[in-house]
């Protein structure tokens, strides 16, 4: 599941965030490669959103692997949904419950896992950190949702990363382009969000069952702090493999290959190597953050 929510910046001096519009030809090729099943799944999700949200629905954007790099075997379909006003408890519960039948993990021939992030437009414009997230649906919540437990709206640092991704590479399925709908995320807030994401992983209980995603998320955070680029997981892994000490490379190589569907995920069976890589990556990320703060 996609848990690092993905700033094109120039460094080291005069750093700024640059928004880019997606390359239409590349986007269309990615969508064609992703297939008709994905398009049908997205269409069904849009129908469901219209049904539950009605006139409150302001915009829907497709972003992530589906429009940038292509979906991999375990990739989510990422949807960013924007509404005008907060949801009632009844609509929140009904929408989350109905999304369960439009999503699957593991992926099937007809359904991929959905990740739906819903926000109230006024909660993120004008921009402030940490922004409020109105709702989030993902397969990691399936057991909780089926048990009748629904998350309320909450502050979420991850929205800084997510909105930066969407402003750069997203397809508007409804409403204006993301670069018009949302303000740029200041560099300081982006760096803060990346650091806060890495700081979540302190011990084995924090990455249990999600080892591959955590390793690749750290590679992406490291790349972004070093170069200002937002890259796909496999691209970030390739970049970092050229810079890692030899003892940490096998673990990252495996995580990349698992993501690409080319290897079996055995990272949980390598606890010492896993903890060593995560500790090393977090120290380097903290160093890069300190260097940014001192410039």
Put a short name on every predicted segment.
Residues 29-60, 90-96, 100, 295:
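Helical scaffold of the NTase/Pol beta-like nucleotidyltransferase catalytic core
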Residues 229-295:
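Structured mid-to-C-terminal alpha-helical surface segments
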Residues 195-254:
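Extended, basic/helix-rich recognition subdomains
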Residues 60-101, 113-121:
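Catalytic metal-binding acidic patch
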Residues 34, 97-208, 215, 290:
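Conserved NTP/Mg2+-binding pocket subregion across the NTase superfamily
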């Amino acid at each position: 599941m996609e848990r690092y929510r993905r700033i094109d910046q120039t460094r080291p001096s005069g750093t700024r965030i640059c928004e880019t519009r997606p390359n239409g030809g590349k986007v269309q090729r990615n969508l064609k490669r992703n297939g008709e099943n994905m398009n049908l799944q997205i269409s069904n999700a849009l129908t469901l959103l219209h049904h539950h949200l009605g006139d409150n629905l302001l915009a829907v954007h497709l972003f992530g692997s589906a429009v940038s790099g292509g979906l991999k075997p375990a990739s989510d379909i990422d949807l960013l949904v924007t509404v005008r006003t907060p949801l009632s408890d009844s609509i929140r519960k009904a929408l989350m419950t109905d999304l369960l039948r439009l999503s699957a993990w593991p992926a099937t021939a007809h359904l991929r896992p959905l990740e739906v992030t819903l926000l109230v437009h006024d909660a993120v414009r004008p921009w402030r950190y940490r922004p409020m997230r109105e709702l989030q649906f993902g397969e990691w919540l399936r057991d909780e949702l089926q048990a009748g437990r629904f998350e309320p709206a909450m502050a979420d640092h991850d929205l800084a990363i997510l909105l930066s991704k969407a402003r750069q590479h997203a397809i508007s399925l409804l409403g204006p382009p993301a670069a018009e709908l949302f303000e740029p995320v200041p560099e300081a807030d982006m760096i803060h969000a990346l650091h806060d994401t890495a700081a979540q992983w302190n011990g084995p209980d924090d990455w249990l069952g999600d080892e591959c995603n955590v390793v690749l998320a750290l590679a992406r955070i490291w790349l972004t702090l070093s170069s200002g680029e937002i890259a796909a997981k496999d691209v970030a892994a390739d970049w970092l493999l050229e810079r890692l000490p030899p003892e940490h490379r096998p673990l990252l190589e495996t995580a990349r290959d698992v993501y690409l569907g080319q290897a079996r995920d055995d990272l949980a069976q390598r606890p010492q190597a896993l903890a060593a890589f995560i500790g090393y990556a977090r120290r380097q990320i903290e160093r890069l953050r300190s260097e940014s703060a001192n410039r």
